[in-house]
Regions:
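Glycine-rich, charged/polar anion/phosphate-binding loops
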Residues: 6-8, 137-140
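A generic structural signal for short coil/turn motifs at secondary-structure boundaries
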Residues: 30-31, 139-141
Length: 158
């Protein structure tokens, strides 16, 4: 058995009047990410982590922001596509560990639904997905509430 790890990162500016989609679910808030798709930083970073671990490129290769068909797209579609590519190469997703970095809102109460949405898209048991949230304690664009970021590590076996 071969084990591979991939790392993903994503960051989006936040703007008023946009939906806040994180981990595949909408979270009530007055701001949301500015992006070509729905701006789901967890799904984007997770997609990059999975593709990177498998040596299959990155989210921009598969879903370029220059392609109008991805405008406003649900980022869970990106995860479903990544899962199909992994299946074709016989990779197994062993574990996903994600951290979302934002000042507000508090995400802990939303983790169960986020985990369910991500697990469903990847066809995984929810216990293979771990989520955490951190703040930047007022430092930089994330700390000032101007942006949201996520970092994800994915472990695959072959």
């Amino acid at each position: 058995m071969s084990v591979r790890c991939g790392i993903g990162y994503d960051l989006h500016r936040l703007a008023e009047g946009r939906k806040l989609i994180i981990g595949g679910i909408e979270i009530p808030f007055d701001k949301g990410p500015v992006g070509h798709s729905d701006g789901d930083v967890v799904a984007h970073a997770l997609c990059d982590a999975l593709l990177g671990a498998a040596g299959l490129g990155d989210i921009g290769t598969h879903f370029p922001d220059t392609d109008p068909k991805w405008k406003g797209a649900n980022s869970l579609l990106f995860l479903e596509h990544a899962r199909k590519l992994l299946d074709e190469k016989h990779f197994v997703i062993e574990h996903v560990d994600a951290v979302v970095i934002l000042e507000r809102p508090k995400l802990g109460p939303h983790f169960p639904k986020m985990r369910e949405a991500l697990a469903k898209s990847l066809r995984l048991p929810p216990e293979k997905i771990h989520l955490k949230a951190k703040t930047n304690e007022g430092v930089d664009a994330v700390g000032r509430g101007e942006a949201i970021a996520a970092q994800v590590v994915a472990t695959l076996s072959l």
